[in-house]
Structure formats: structure tokens, C-alpha cells
Amino acid sequence: MKKNQFLKESDVTAESVFFMKRRQVLKALGISAAALSLPHAAHADLLSWFKGNDRPPAPAGKALEFSKPAAWQNNLPLTPADKVSGYNNFYEFGLDKADPAANAGSLKTDPWTLKISGEVAKPLTLDHDDLTRRFPLEERIYRMRCVEAWSMVVPWIGFPLHKLLALAEPTSNAKYVAFETIYAPEQMPGQQDRFIGGGLKYPYVEGLRLDEAMHPLTLMTVGVYGKALPPQNGAPVRLIVPWKYGFKGIKSIVSIKLTRERPPTTWNLAAPDEYGFYANVNPHVDHPRWSQATERFIGSGGILNVQRQPTLLFNGYAEQVASLYRGLDLRENF
């Protein structure tokens, strides 16, 4: 696996600069109440920088045993741990970037059951311990690109999804893989209240083509920064598909089902003209309400000196994955 393009050391966010009280920052910048009345997604390019509590906690899960294969270690400077665990989209716990860190402690992740079913010869059920012990874990340093045009670099820990699927033995009828998040409204306030949860239909669902799911880059992720995932990052297990926008990285997965037909996906159901099934990172295909040509790396300059950088096709993984989409119109199949 060849190394990808890398970012400058100056783009790494210092531990002390990112989390500031929203009211203080908005007042300092003279942002009016009218700006705050814009639709949530319409000001993703602006307000997502000003949300949050003072210092959401860094990951505090148990330490994991894992290897660091050279193929997945690179020159990408890491986004600090407190930013990775404190600046999240997980609408089941609220719309604000700091809400998941503040509210996700209510999620019970042990015991846990993950079922693999559908078009497979050998259906499987994994428990909480299986997720960290059944497969050799490895650390992979990946870019993470949100559809809101901000990005991070994260040292995820997990195992390739294809290893799990191989155990289940997909049949010749399997063409797609459908994923589902836990439905637990008593633990997830966004599932209980449509206002808190952004009006989405829950449980959250996602999907991939089978060849995408079997690609070596696609990771079943159980840890970050050497420890088990914290709830706000999708504990105990989430999906990471680094060449796709972050909303494809479904969190807190309880079901994986192989299917003949393309499965529904949450954001495509909510706004099909804005969020496609493929969701490949593409600087040439804009979101209807903002450009995808550049992105804001969570960096050391602070919110008053935000440095934008060009968005890379397939998030910098084109050499590895472009062949999956040969002959496919990426503008039409966004």
C-alpha cells in the first residue's frame, strides 16, 4: 500500500486552541443572531467551528493490543485525541458537535451483539469481546473527510471488514452490504426526540456495494488512539471507509446484512438530492449548498486563522480505489 499525500505539521491543532465557549467566540467575531437562525446544514461551513464545551474528554476506553503494520503508518500528522473525541457528528446524541461527548455516556456498550445475516452461508453473531479478540487488531492512520467540508487525520484501530465477511461466506446472490445502528431511544435522546435528532428516521442505516465492503481499506473499527472507542465515536464498533464522506461511517453497529438489492441509507432517504448512496469524496461534485473543492483541516491555526486545503479525489486514496468506479459517472452517482 503506497503512502498518500500528507499535510504540514503546522496544520495540526494545538490541544489548547480548539474548544472555546460558543457565546464568547460568536461575540468576539460579531456574528449576529440572524446568522444563527440559518438552517442547520446551510451554515455548516461557519458555525461548526464555534460549537462545543470547553474541553470534551479524551478517549478513556480500555487499552487495546494491536499491531502497527508499516503499510498503514504514514506521514500524515494526527488530529489530537481530544479533538477526535470532542468534535463529532452523532445525531442520536444531539446536533451540536459537542453533544455526543456530553451525552453519549448513557450508551451501554457491554453486553453487545452484532449479527451478520442475509445472503451468507454461515450467519454469525459476535459479542462484545469478539469485537476485540476474534480478529487481530491493527492501527491505521486514515484521513477522515466530513461532507461538511472539514477533515481530520485519525489513528483508528480495527480489522478489515472483509475478514468478518469471509467467515460468513457471502453467497453468489450477495451484491450489497447493509448496516444498522442500535435502536435504543432510552439511551439515545436523538432517537427519542426528532428535534434533538435532526428529524432523521432511526435507526441509522448505511450500505456499501459488496466490492467496496471487501476492499482492504474498509475497516471495522473498535478503537482510536490506542484505546477502545469512546461512545461518542461509535463504540463499541463502527465502520470506517476512508475514501467516502464521514456519514458513511455508521456507528454503534448491531446488524450487518448482505443483500441482493441496494439497501436504503439514512441521509439519502432524508435528502436524496444532497446525499447520494456512494458519497465518494470528490472535489468536483459540490454539495448543493456548499463547495467540496476545499476543506478545513482541524489544525493549529485556531478558528481565527483557518487554513483551507484542496480536497483530494477519493480523499487521497484514488490510487487504491478508483478502479472500483471505472466507467461510473461520479457526478451522477454521487
From Swiss-Prot:
Q: Does the keyword Metal-binding apply?
A: yes
Q: Which residues bind Mo-molybdopterin?
A: 88, 91-92, 146, 181, 233, 238, 249-251
Q: Which InterPro entries match?
A: MsrP, OxRdtase_Mopterin-bd_dom, OxRdtase_Mopterin-bd_sf, TAT_signal
UniProt-annotated location(s): Periplasm
Question: What Gene Ontology cellular component terms go with this record?
Answer: periplasmic space
Q: How is it modified after translation?
A: Predicted to be exported by the Tat system. The position of the signal peptide cleavage has not been experimentally proven.
Q: How is the cofactor bound?
A: Binds 1 Mo-molybdopterin (Mo-MPT) cofactor per subunit.
Q: Which UniProt keywords apply?
A: Metal-binding, Molybdenum, Oxidoreductase, Periplasm, Signal
Cofactor(s) annotated in UniProt: Mo-molybdopterin
Q: Give the record's GO biological process terms.
A: protein repair
Q: Which PANTHER family match?
A: PROTEIN-METHIONINE-SULFOXIDE REDUCTASE (PTHR43032), PROTEIN-METHIONINE-SULFOXIDE REDUCTASE CATALYTIC SUBUNIT MSRP (PTHR43032:SF3)
State its role: Part of the MsrPQ system that repairs oxidized periplasmic proteins containing methionine sulfoxide residues (Met-O), using respiratory chain electrons. Thus protects these proteins from oxidative-stress damage caused by reactive species of oxygen and chlorine generated by the host defense mechanisms. MsrPQ is essential for the maintenance of envelope integrity under bleach stress, rescuing a wide series of structurally unrelated periplasmic proteins from methionine oxidation, including the primary periplasmic chaperone SurA and the lipoprotein Pal.
Tell me the subunit arrangement: Heterodimer of a catalytic subunit (MsrP) and a heme-binding subunit (MsrQ).
Its family remark reads: Belongs to the MsrP family.
Q: What is the protein named?
A: Protein-methionine-sulfoxide reductase catalytic subunit MsrP
Q: In which organism is this protein found?
A: Escherichia coli O1:K1 / APEC
Q: Tell me the classification of the organism that encodes this protein.
A: Bacteria, Pseudomonadati, Pseudomonadota, Gammaproteobacteria, Enterobacterales
